[in-house]
Amino acid sequence: MEKNSAMVEFSYLEKNELDKYARMLFSILFDNMVNIAPTGNSREEDYKSWYKAVCGEMQSDKRHIIVISNGNMKEIIGFFKYSTNESVFTMEEIQIKRSYQGKYNIFKTLYGFVLEHIAEEIRFVEAYADKKNTKSLGILGKLGLSIIGENKNGISYHLRGTYEALVKWYKKESV
């Protein structure tokens, strides 16, 4: 566990604990996305779809979820899902409760935690962001990522940058 001054902690979710925390993680995602990119499905339909996808993804040793809590898992306030593959670090999903967004330096502290835990051979950073999510696109731009294409269904942009640019951002500025 790593803390910052606001008692925010980061911990890796053990793959066998996904069932225990899945609804809490999804609730944060759903509450954030309902206004940005609603699916038109019920909350339960979206949960089942998300859960099935995440369970499948978490079978890989290269995929991880970092849980963000406000101290000893008293309250989960967010999560970060990522994967690594040879020289690429893919930021798959970051969700922070609205009431904590932009506070306590969570975002930058999270990246400090991540940078300590990913392999040195990483050279590139990638992410996908919904085309309508201008906030995410702006943040990814500050991290040194640029649009290089779209996902298969055209809903999201595919972005890429260098690991070096991410480290430079972490050492210099806040988002």
Model-identified regions with their sequence ranges:
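Conserved catalytic-core motifs of GNAT/GCN5-like acyltransferases
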Residues: 128, 144-162
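Acetyl-CoA-dependent GNAT
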Residues: 12-16, 23-92, 97-99, 111
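Conserved GNAT acetyl-CoA-binding A-motif
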Residues: 118-129
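Conserved beta-strand-loop-alpha-helix junction that forms the acyl-donor binding cleft
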Residues: 127-137
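Conserved N-terminal entry element of GNAT/NAT acetyltransferase domains
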Residues: 1-27, 165-175
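Conserved acetyl-CoA-binding loop-helix of GNAT-fold acetyltransferases
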Residues: 96, 102-116, 138-142
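Short acidic/glycine-enriched loop/turn segments that link adjacent beta-strands
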Residues: 87, 133, 153-156
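Short loop/turn motifs at secondary-structure junctions
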Residues: 90, 121-123, 144
